[in-house]
Amino acid sequence: MAAARPTIAVADLGSGNLRSVAKAVEAAGGAAVVSSDPDLVARADKLVVPGQGAFGGCAAGLDRGGGELRQAVIAAIDGGRPYFGICIGLQLLFEGSDEDPSCPGLAIMPGRVRKFAPVPGLKIPHMGWNQTRRGPARTGLVPDGDEAGYFYFVHSYYPAPERAEDVALTSEHGEPFCAAVARDNVFACQFHPEKSQAAGLALLRRFVQS
């Protein structure tokens, strides 16, 4: 008899390619449920938080209905529920962002989200495939070895963790930047695994099966 697939809540913050993320989670072996219902988030085995667009818009999505979804996400993380953040779902883990300074993040990790500095000849947003390398944080979701693979990025802002030990992956766009973080039950990436073909699917599969 096949083992039951874990129920994975894909949090609907009102933006992001939710259908693509849900399909990728299903392909990785999870039972994806797209929802903004705090009760469903509280019951799910694991949590994926995607987001596209502006930091403030996604933060507002957490705060719809009196902030119950924000509290459900924080409670899930504090309770040890596996969390996988994608793009803005990574940035929301921090205290805030230079993009929308008045909007608070979840403050799970110390640090802020910064904008790439303008460099002659450098295109912003950073868009396309880029190589990643291992950072100090160790996680079973990322294979051993300095080079951790190529992933697809679309962003103008990047996380700047205060703790170097939270950095799981780095990449470079004019300057080195944090491409993923990991601590305990939390993993989040600035790139889009659902757009990153085999490398992205392998990463999601390790999350689903962990």
Model-derived regions: residue spans:
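An anion/phosphate-binding loop that grips the pyrophosphate of nucleotide cofactors and donors
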Residues: 44
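Pocket-forming structural segment of enzyme catalytic cores
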Residues: 95-173
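Structural motif
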Residues: 48-50
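Short, surface-exposed beta-strand/loop micro-motifs that present aromatic residues
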Residues: 175-182
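Extreme N-terminal starter segment of soluble prokaryotic enzymes
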Residues: 4-9
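Beta-strand-turn-beta hairpins that frame and shape the catalytic cleft
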Residues: 148, 182-187
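Cysteine-nucleophile active-site neighborhood
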Residues: 53-127
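Acyltransferase
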Residues: 189-210
